Amino acid sequence: MFHPRARTMLLLSLPALIIGVASSLVLIAAMKVASVFQQFLWQRLPTNIGIAYDSPFWIVGMLTLTGVVVGLIIRYSPGHAGPDPAIEPLISMPVSPSALPGLLLALIIGLAGGVSLGPEHPIMTINIALAAAFGSRLFPRITALDWTILASAGTIGALFGTPVAAALIFSQTLSGSNDIPMWDRLFAPLMAAAAGSLTTSLFFHPHFSLPIAHYTQMRLVDIASGAIVAAIAIAAGMVAVWCLPRLHELLHRLKNPVLILGIGGFILGILGVIGGPLTLFKGLDEMQQMAFSQTLGAGDYFTLAVVKLAALVIAAASGFRGGRIFPAVFIGAALGLMLHAHVEAVPAAITVSCAILGLVLVVTRDGWLSLFMAAVVVPDTNLLPLLCIVMLPAWLLLAGKPLLAANRHEP
């Protein structure tokens, strides 16, 4: 009844569905545990002790302790809590399963303790390793590369609550040929992403969109304004690109993860005191609080953006286990709100979306993901043509530039 091509796609459907659901469940479990632990550390415990959770003493002490604990996990756990996210790309080949318990624990403690990183890199590493380990036993004919693709697609769908991001990302990597069309190659990853996003939606829905005034009509001056905003965001991001490898090398001369992460946590605490609680944690909930605030002005948004960018660099350079996409979105939103407050003639929809596009592009060097993040934070169809046009000069600015990554050091 089905063409051989269709049968091949159907054979991959079951593994794709399983991987997508499992990828989402791993993410949900980690986020739920981290959320409960965060509430204990930042609400119940300081209340019981009689200390304000936003007091300098508590912020510095909690982040320093978080760094020390994560450092102990990295030093003494099997596999040293997986690869350093500052060195490895978001999607890479499977790591040893023995490293996963330490990696998961380091992620949860970092998220709960207020470290300015998201869950995407460790969750991606965990899901890829689990998929390759169990999948190769259940379906030995499927290669490790295929398991990597399915797990990463399922994780992307789960993280962003939609399979669209996975479809965009893998459409540029899984190019078709005369024998195998692109959509044949996309079928299984897209199914994994759909399963991951649907499973996530049963428990919670990632809320990215901000309450920003509707953008009515594109004008030529708006294109120029958007390009300038994106260029400013890229310039800010390139400061982080310059700082990260140098700071990473400087800190890792100490050799001891406990000392490195303890110092990193202490610096994060100092930054948290300067920027306030909004600059802590992964940034999505804090971005909503920032956008809904009626008291913040241009100077406040600037402080939030600078402190969060510095915290992102410190956290990544120290070796905390976490991703950089979610904090980059927060930084872009803060930068965009600051620019709109300075020049109110430029709509906030343009400043926020184009700043996010520029920052995420620096962090990921993925045009589709950058467009996607800008579009979901400011969900306005009138903006899509403008964002696509603004992407062109932004991509030119970053062509051939170094990535936001540290260099691998000899032990």
Curated annotation (Swiss-Prot):
It comes from the Bacteria. GO terms for cellular component: plasma membrane. The chain crosses the membrane at residues 9-29, 54-74, 99-119, 149-169, 186-206, 223-243, 258-278, 296-316, 322-342, 343-363, 386-406. GO terms for molecular function: chloride transmembrane transporter activity; monoatomic ion channel activity. Keywords: Cell membrane, Ion channel, Ion transport, Membrane, Transmembrane, Transmembrane helix, Transport. Pfam families: Voltage_CLC. Gene3D superfamilies: Clc chloride channel (1.10.3080.10). Its main location: membrane. The keyword Transport applies. It is found in: Cell membrane. Belongs to the chloride channel (TC 2.A.49) family. This is Putative ion-transport protein YfeO. It comes from Salmonella choleraesuis (strain SC-B67). The gene is yfeO.
